[in-house]
Each structure stands twice: as C-alpha cells, then as structure tokens.
Amino acid sequence: MRGNDMRKLLDALYEYAAYAAALFMIGTLVAVLAGIVDRYLNLGVRGTDMYAGYCMAAAGFLALAHTLKNGEHIRVSLILQKLHAVAKHRLEVWALFAATALAALFAAFSVKLAYNSWQFHDISTGNDATPLWIPQTAMAIGTVILLIAFVDELVLEIKGRRVEKTSDEALHNE
C-alpha cells in the first residue's frame, strides 16, 4: 500500500468514526426523549437512561481520534511556542511517544474489558440487563482508533511531515 493510499485510509477511518459518534449522539437524544415520553405516557419502556449513557459513552470514545487529528484536544502550547525548532521537535516526539504509550495501555485495557465481559456474560445492573460487552465494544473500538491516530501523529512528527492543526475557535478568557 502506497503512502498516499494509507493516508486516505487513515483519514477515512477517523472520519467514519466521527460519523459513528454523531449517530450515537442522535441515539442519546432518542433514548432521552423516549424516557421523557415514557414517564408521561407510562409505556413501560425500560432502560432508556442506561441506553442514553451507553450512546453518550460510545459517542465520546469514537470521536477521540477525529478530535485529535483536527487539533481540538486541549494542549498546553505555551512552552512549545518559546522553543527553537529542534527542541520543539524533540519535545513533540517525546509527548507523542508518551501519549501513544498511554493510548496503547488504554486500548489494551478497553479491549480486555470488553472481551472479559463477553467471556463471563457480564450484564448491566439496571433493569435493562444489557450484556456489557456491547457498549464496551464501542469504547474499545474508539480507544484502538485513538491509538492508531497517536501512532500516525508520532510517525508524521518523526518524519517531519506533521502539520499541526489548531482549533478555529477563538480563545476564551473566563
């Protein structure tokens, strides 16, 4: 696979994960609305609060990589702005390596958690009795995609090809 094809594949992965996150946000809205309607009409719909939580968690984890790649994560760049190019590059490599290592641990834990929940038939304690591996799988997928994004950023920084994206949002002082 050529580099350009790999870039397109990775960008598509981050983009589709963001689309999935958006769908889960809609799922959160639907679950909350269903719970509200159920309280007024007493329809007997069970577990809407739990499903809203599952959808919200899935949305958050699936959006992590896209957020990282678009420069939307919180960063302390005051030190980086003061450094010369070589020192800045070294600090960026160190920070990205540390973040990649943490993301790898997080992904490994998330995958193991979902697998163990599936293996031991773990279910939620709510009245919905959902097998926990189902919502945990979204977390595992999101953390694995985040790990891929950090490896991508690290490799780009080492090769000197990383383009730092910054948020278009204006700085806020409160």
What is each of the regions a protein language model found here?
Residues M1-E174:
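Alpha-helical transmembrane segments and membrane-interface helix-loop junctions
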